[in-house]
């Protein structure tokens, strides 16, 4: 499927990028990772090292997710534009992780890069008043992701 992405929304990026990275770094450091880079370079948000292995991490926020994950949201949706990361790190997908944070940045879904396959890229369905027609997402069943707490 052709990946459709909406135009860049600087005001949204400016609002969520800093808090998303801060929450991600807090979680990663609590898991024993050393931060190698958090520089904005259009690739992974945060690069870490743990046990001599380099890892790549990308953060998103789902503002509509406030407290507990509603189980009627059967899928976690990661924008199709993130395919550029899957392509960039295609030889290291087992070391690539995507995180989708809730509104409060105290919980996240963690998804491994190996799960990000073209077969799960689809247009969003359901109430899509915030999503431009045709925008594509990776649709990952929430049962196939790991929920992590940020403390």
Q: How should these model regions be labeled?
A:
Residues 1-42:
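Acidic-basic catalytic patches of nuclease active cores, encompassing PD-(D/E)XK
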Residues 8, 30, 91-151:
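Non-catalytic C-terminal interaction segments of nucleic acid-processing enzymes
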Residues 28, 46-67:
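Conserved catalytic cores of phosphodiester-cleaving nucleases, focusing on short active-site segments
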Residues 33-38, 84-91:
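Short linear motifs in intrinsically disordered
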Residues 38-40, 57-60, 101-102:
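Short His-Asn-centered micro-motif
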Residues 40-44, 105-106:
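Short acidic/glycine-enriched loop/turn segments that link adjacent beta-strands
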Residues 41-43, 52-56, 91-94:
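Short connector loops at helix/strand junctions that flank enzyme active sites
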Residues 62-89:
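Mg2+/Mn2+-dependent nuclease catalytic core
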């Amino acid at each position: 499927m052709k990946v459709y992405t909406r135009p860049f929304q600087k005001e949204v990026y400016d609002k969520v990028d800093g808090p998303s990275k801060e929450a991600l770094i807090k979680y990663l450091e609590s898991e024993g990772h050393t931060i190698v880079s958090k520089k904005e370079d259009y690739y992974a948000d945060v690069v870490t090292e743990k046990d001599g292995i380099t890892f790549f991490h990308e953060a998103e926020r789902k503002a509509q997710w406030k407290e507990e994950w509603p189980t009627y949201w059967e899928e976690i949706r990661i924008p199709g534009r993130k395919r550029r990361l899957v392509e960039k790190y295609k030889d290291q997908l087992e070391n690539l992780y995507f995180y989708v944070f809730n509104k409060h940045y105290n919980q996240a879904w963690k998804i491994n890069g190996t799960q990000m396959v073209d077969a799960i890229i689809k247009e969003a369905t359901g109430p899509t008043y915030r999503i431009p027609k045709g925008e594509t997402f990776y649709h990952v069943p929430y049962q196939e992701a790991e929920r992590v707490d940020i403390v």
